[in-house]
């Protein structure tokens, strides 16, 4: 769910989730156009993963509760007993790890929406 995802981001990046709420064309609500950089691509992949969770698996990824561990910046999805919990946890885990690896460019925070056409 979105609260767990926020905490995963904090675990891997030590940044506030607000730093990612309006970044590039895909980080935050919705998304369109071409991702502006690697971090924005992470967000597009995460959006696509949530889309697959909804369409293919019938999940509600923004509300699906799951279990995970965070230790020294390492994320592990725990033994989630349903396909939705496991799938959504891995969507969020993959994105949080991707966020940690991708450079953060302040110039891509709150960018002009026409760049995302």
UniProtKB/Swiss-Prot annotation:
InterPro entries: PLipase_A2, PLipase_A2_Asp_AS, PLipase_A2_dom, PLipase_A2_dom_sf, PLipase_A2_His_AS. The active site is at 46, 92. One of its GO terms (biological process) is phosphatidylcholine catabolic process. GO terms for molecular function: calcium ion binding; calcium-dependent phospholipase A2 activity; phospholipase A2 activity; phospholipid binding. Expressed by the venom gland. Its cofactor is Ca(2+). It catalyses: a 1,2-diacyl-sn-glycero-3-phosphocholine + H2O = a 1-acyl-sn-glycero-3-phosphocholine + a fatty acid + H(+). It comes from the Eukaryota. Glycans are attached at residue 80. Ca(2+) binds at residues 26, 28, 30, 47. It is an enzyme of class 3 (hydrolase). One of its GO terms (cellular component) is extracellular region. Belongs to the phospholipase A2 family. Group I subfamily. D49 sub-subfamily. Snake venom phospholipase A2 (PLA2) that shows strong myotoxicity and induces edema in mice. Shows no cytotoxicity in vitro. Has a strong anticoagulant effect in vitro. PLA2 catalyzes the calcium-dependent hydrolysis of the 2-acyl groups in 3-sn-phosphoglycerides. This is Acidic phospholipase A2. It comes from Micrurus dumerilii (Coral snake).
